[in-house]
Amino acid sequence: SDFARLLAIQVVDWLHDLEKSEIGFELFSLVEIGPGEGTLSRDLILAVGEIAPALISKIEIVLVELNAGMRERQEKVVNKLEGVNYRWSNIDDLISSPVTGVIVANEVLDAFPVERLVFTQNKVFRQGVSLRRKNDDYYLEFVDLMPTSLIMNFLNDSNSLLKIEFPPKDICNRWVTEWHCDLPNWFKKLSNVLSNGSLLVVDYAMESKRYYSANRKDGTLISYRNQEANSNLLKDAGLCDLTAHLCIESTINYALTNGWSFMGETRQGQALLALGLSGFLYSLQNTDINNLSAALNRRESLLRLVDPMGLGDFRWLAFQKSNNDDLILGKRFLEEPTS
């Protein structure tokens, strides 16, 4: 995919930077957390091979997948790769044998569990779900629970460390928002997985002033079934995917307090343009007339990647882990777009 080809340009930069730093290692690891069908890992390693063939023998792909059914599907994709080192693992096993390289988490964190918080009459509640019975029918409904000490710590720390006001001024009654409660531990674990290298998070995210705006009265949590969004989170419970945006400042703070340094963040559209997407578009001008249909389809998919109303609004957040003070990783994805 073109997405993988462009991302590979940044990945190759990082691997070359690690190579120059003369850090001792057996193989560089290209780790994908939650690899889906396995197509991104496959396309990434193929693109790395095109850009820097000498690196292929020095790299292993590590797919971190907990679901046995998904792993079987990934095997069908990745097993077709020739001359490539690859394996499946989990975070705990990687902690016991840390790696050097690049970790990619593409559309992973938006699916993490969240605590849902309800603000009403100067009080905050933890939102719970209760199973109720009416006649012979059972149904789910939201209930207000007392907040845990962890929730109160989150609210206090957000205020004191990040200057995020809870609740914001002029909220409606029963203003709702989310807290990504599993992020601190995730960053902590990953900092023990990686000895030296980078972590790239690609996901739905927004600044705290938008995330915790009085106008965003229902939070960011949304339900998807068959690619259709629904704000009724209890409809078809158990059959839907639930996703919630990340708060950029909170996410960065959790990384900084759990072993990472912050390299920078940008919108996906800007990142891909910086990595040369416009050059990909330009090359389509020389398409043979017989391949016009394929070229137009490719042009559409490239433009979708940078569409500010869609995929282009994804955020790229990059973090560095280093046990070597001399390690400097480049940030081509943050540079001014190339023409």
Language-model segments: residues:
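Short, glycine/acidic-enriched loop or turn micro-motifs at the edges of active sites
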Residues: 68, 109, 206
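Beta-sheet entry/capping signal
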Residues: 29, 60, 87-88, 100-102, ...
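A short SAM/SAH-binding and catalytic strip from SAM-dependent methyltransferases
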Residues: 92-94, 98-121, 173-181, 185, ...
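Short alpha-helical segments and helix-capping/turn motifs at coil-helix boundaries
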Residues: 10, 86-91, 101, 185-187, ...
